[in-house]
């Protein structure tokens, strides 16, 4: 730990000196930019945000007034946004000591021109902005529904029955991608690092149930945060950083989802959403409170995966509040203050099936929690610094998995020993009910402070904004963990058994970070400019060395984005703007508690069992405990990204194309390890009675009345368990694009075409144990390199028809998948195939690297590895260890092009009502893809889906 702390301390000191070194640079005259923001009727707009050159910001007070101190003279760009109003951008010339800027905003309404209901590309970097109008039109149930507007995504029907995971640049779901996607709400990251909701990670990995019920995948342990806890109706806007994020954001690999909730005044609104599978009610209002505004919301939803099976249901209640104000408006150092809170209660049920009711079975997952955060900005005019941003938050939840299972045929002997040894055991040879509970109480604390120095450079609109910050995160779990009656375990007599485990014994995670960045914009001549965002982030995760095997993990993350604009109206007559952008960045996702502190592995072997009555009934169990299941070499998952893109605007048309390359290394998983088990086996004579176990011996009385000691022999067995490991990697290449053709006025319709080509190659990176069959006395170790390669090219043609005169907008989306291909691979690090063709040409084969021979082993110390000899492939005893594959196993599985049509409609009914309708695959297209080799089938089109929404305003 001392090494990590010293490196972090020295690095922070160096970065602090670099930051302090730029403070005296600014010598330009500074001014106060002040003014008033009103609506079209001249009424003040409260809590409107004003941002200058993406660096200086404030909000308006209850009179609509604002003031930004320390604005250097010259031209500056600004933008203003507020809940319920259309965003406004412009340029203002700063002159003298005070510059007046009065802004008049238009309310968002469908009778106004310029409605945008698709994701917008943000400058410099791969970022998609989904604003108020798009959120309103998409009719989401959760945050994950909004991800469909990101280029490369395909249509999926809104559902609350499945986990809501955010993935970036993915073809199919992937746990490491979801885990590496940071979700930030109002400046606060939603942490899932303290989630331990799994029954036995060393045995079942991430599942919360040992059996294949619909409830064993409701946990997000080892995955990303469940986005169903966020009310989609309380979202004002959302930004998705697909590429390289600023160094302000940490503990991630895939991307960032930034959610801004509603703040400011708004009319009382009530919504009713309904579809064949669910119903949702929401009400919210924003109102003045003292010198600020309060915005509150409440929603209730109920969803079923199948309307014929109401025993598979999901219920959600969320409540949100947000208070915003500004202190010291008009002073040299005004401070904005935002307080946001939320409460949620989610319940998954699986219990009302008639058959389950008859068997008295019940599975339930409950998640109740809340978040509270305070964040804001302080202007520091007259000081060495320009401003200070602060963010403090706390999150706590209680997740409970309750399972009542029926164990129809137990193996007979159970043990409650928590330590290794030989002990008397209980006999359980009748069917029974097992009740077990997994309780997790994850607690997360986050604090971040950022300071910046805004410096006006020589040209009238050139600037640099240097920013430094420090961040602290705490992740802990205070739940009781896995609990059950040891006399009625979830499984009985298994070779690997369950034991209760309290999460309160697991150390908390402490993560300290420091970052330094610079955002600059420079004029490079007529019509040319260059801007960049570059910085470095240092992070240290402090660990309990005694329990994790390491004292800490230290990472350095350099990142940079840049954009060079070389054509504008100033130097050509065709392009309004043409620029090239690029970036490079390294990001790390620290391992969570789930991977750092796995449970012990328990193995129970029956040494003796006699199912008699009274004196002829006895059981002895040998328990072996593996208590060193941690991986002291566990590393953070790391991503390295490169990007280059082209952005253009020609009249009413605009768009971009972006190429990216991503290398993801050290991704998390569980790796099998074997353990040789040795135990004493006791045998007695027929007709024995008065069985007893004392001092490590089984005694009995034979039929002649003689006291005897049971004969002994040694039993041997090999079992496996899972250890956390960095055993996966992903390589990604692709092209993302979007082109907005603008509106054709004659038909009031615009066309936006977006899509992507994704190429994703995934494979395991660790040699692994292979199970052949029960009773086989060799354990092969296979080479790493199994995986898949997937490609997909898709386009979305979004026809947006907006008719202001009737306050209506409808969108017809034609989704086309031009190319889709998947194949399995088995290759080495250089890409060479590890499989070879058999001598008769009927199959492919992969031989082990080595194996363990346990035949006739009398002592576990005698087990040794034997390198594989090619001649073993023809040996009847050893050839079973060779993996065999059909000739088509590594062939391409290509899907023919396919398309579907979706429709969304929104209509305002006066000033007090709005109706919306959506239909996915409304032509009821149905197509299954059949693998021509394996004949397996999979559905291409989502099921037809119809939903409606009614909103009332008061």
Language model segments and positions:
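Short, acidic, small-residue-rich periplasmic hinge/interaction motif at the N-terminus
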Residues: 36-43, 48-51, 81-85, 95-136
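Extracytoplasmic beta-strand/coil segments of soluble accessory domains associated
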Residues: 144, 148-211
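Short acidic/polar hinge/loop motifs at secondary-structure boundaries
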Residues: 188-241
């Amino acid at each position: 730990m001392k090494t990590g702390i010293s490196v972090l301390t020295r690095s922070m000191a160096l970065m602090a000196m670099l930051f302090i070194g730029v403070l005296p640079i600014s010598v330009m005259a500074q001014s106060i930019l002040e003014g008033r923001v009103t609506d079209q009727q001249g009424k003040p707009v409260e809590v409107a945000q004003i941002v200058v050159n993406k660096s200086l910001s404030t909000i308006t007070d209850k009179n609509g007034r604002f003031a930004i101190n320390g604005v250097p003279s010259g031209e500056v760009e600004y933008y203003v946004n507020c809940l319920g109003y259309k965003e406004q951008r412009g340029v203002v010339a700063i002159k003298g000591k005070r510059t007046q800027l009065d802004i008049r905003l238009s309310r968002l309404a469908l009778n106004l021109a310029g409605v945008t209901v698709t994701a917008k590309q943000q400058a410099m970097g791969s970022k998609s902005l989904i604003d108020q109008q798009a959120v309103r039109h998409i009719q989401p149930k959760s945050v994950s529904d909004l991800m469909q507007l990101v280029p490369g995504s395909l249509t999926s029907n809104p559902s609350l029955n499945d986990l809501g995971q955010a993935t970036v640049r993915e073809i199919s779901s992937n746990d490491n991608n979801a885990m590496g996607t940071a979700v930030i709400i109002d400046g606060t990251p939603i942490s899932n690092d303290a989630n331990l909701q799994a029954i036995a990670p060393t045995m079942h990995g991430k599942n919360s149930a040992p059996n294949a019920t619909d409830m064993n995948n409701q946990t997000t342990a080892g995955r990303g945060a469940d986005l169903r806890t966020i009310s989609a109706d309380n979202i004002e806007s959302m930004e998705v950083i697909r590429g390289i994020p600023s160094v302000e954001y940490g503990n991630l690999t895939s991307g960032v989802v930034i959610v801004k909730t509603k703040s400011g005044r708004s009319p009382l609104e009530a919504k009713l959403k309904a579809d064949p599978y669910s119903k949702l009610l929401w009400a919210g209002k924003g109102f003045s409170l003292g010198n600020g505004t309060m915005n509150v919301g409440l929603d209730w939803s109920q969803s079923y995966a199948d309307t014929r099976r109401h025993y598979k249901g999901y219920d959600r209640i969320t409540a949100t509040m947000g208070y915003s104000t500004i202190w010291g408006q008009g002073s040299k150092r005004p401070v904005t203050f935002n307080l946001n809170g939320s409460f949620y209660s989610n319940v998954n049920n699986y219990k009302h099936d008639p058959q389950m009711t008859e068997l008295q079975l019940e599975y339930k997952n409950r998640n109740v929690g809340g978040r509270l955060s305070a964040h804001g900005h302080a202007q520091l005019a007259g000081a060495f610094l320009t401003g200070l941003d602060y963010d403090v938050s706390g999150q706590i939840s209680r997740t409970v998995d309750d399972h009542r299972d029926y164990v129809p045929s137990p193996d007979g002997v159970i043990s409650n020993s928590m330590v290794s040894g030989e002990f008397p055991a209980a006999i359980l040879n009748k069917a029974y009910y097992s009740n077990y509970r997994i309780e997790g109480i994850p607690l997360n604390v986050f604090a971040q402070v950022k300071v910046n120095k805004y410096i006006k450079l020589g040209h009238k609109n050139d600037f640099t904004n240097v920013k430094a910050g420090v961040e602290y995160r705490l992740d802990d779990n205070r739940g009781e963990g896995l609990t059950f009656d040891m006399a009625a375990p979830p499984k009985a007599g298994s070779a690997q058994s369950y034991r209760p485990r309290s999460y309160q014994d697991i150390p908390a995670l402490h993560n300290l970070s420091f970052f330094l960045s610079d955002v600059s914009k420079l004029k490079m001549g007529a019509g040319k400019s260059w801007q960049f965002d570059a910085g470095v982030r240092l992070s240290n995760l402090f660990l309990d060395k005694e329990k994790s095997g390491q004292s800490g993990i230290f990472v350095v993350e350099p990142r940079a984005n840049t954009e060079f604009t070389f054509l504008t109206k100033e130097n050509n007559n065709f392009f309004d703007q043409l620029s090239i952008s690029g970036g490079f960045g390294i990001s790390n996702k620290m391992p969570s508690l789930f991977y750092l502190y796995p449970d012990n592995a328990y193995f129970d072997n029956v040494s003796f069992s006699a199912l008699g009555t009274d004196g002829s009934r006895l059981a002895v169990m040998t328990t072996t405990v593996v208590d060193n299941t941690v991986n002291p070499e566990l590393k953070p998952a790391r991503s390295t990204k490169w990007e280059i893109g082209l952005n253009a605007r020609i009249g009413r048309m605009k768009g971009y194309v972006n190429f990216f390359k991503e290398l993801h290394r050290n991704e998390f998983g569980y790796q099998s390890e074997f353990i040789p088990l040795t135990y004493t086996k006791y045998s007695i004579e027929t007709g024995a009675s008065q069985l007893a176990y004392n001092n490590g011996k089984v005694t009995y009385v034979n039929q002649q009345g003689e006291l005897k000691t049971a004969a002994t022999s040694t039993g041997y067995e090999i079992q496996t368990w899972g250890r956390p490991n960095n055993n996966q990697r992903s390589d990604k290449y692709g092209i993302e694009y979007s082109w907005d053709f603008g509106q054709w006025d004659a038909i009031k319709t615009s066309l936006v075409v977006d899509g992507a080509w994704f190429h994703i190659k995934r494979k395991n990176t660790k040699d692994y144990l292979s199970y052949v069959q029960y009773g086989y006395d060799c354990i092969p170790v296979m080479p790493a390199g199994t995986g898949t390669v997937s490609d997909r090219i898709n386009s979305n043609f979004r026809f947006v028809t907006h008719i202001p005169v009737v306050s209506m907008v409808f969108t017809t989306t034609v989704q086309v998948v031009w190319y889709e291909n998947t194949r399995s691979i088995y290759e080495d690090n250089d890409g060479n195939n590890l499989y070879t063709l058999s001598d008769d040409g009927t199959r492919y084969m992969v031989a082990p690297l080595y194996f363990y021979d346990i035949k006739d082993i009398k002592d576990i110390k005698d087990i040794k590895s034997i390198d594989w000899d090619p001649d073993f492939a023809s040996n009847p005893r050893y050839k079973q260890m060779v993996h065999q594959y059909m000739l088509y196993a590594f062939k391409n599985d290509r899907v023919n092009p396919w398309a579907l049509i979706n429709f969304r409609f929104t209509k305002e009914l006066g000033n007090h009502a709005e109706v919306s309708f959506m239909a996915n695959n409304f032509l009821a297209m149905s197509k299954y893809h059949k693998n021509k080799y394996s004949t397996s089938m999979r559905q291409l089109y989502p099921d037809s889906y119809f939903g409606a929404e009614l909103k009332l305003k008061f």
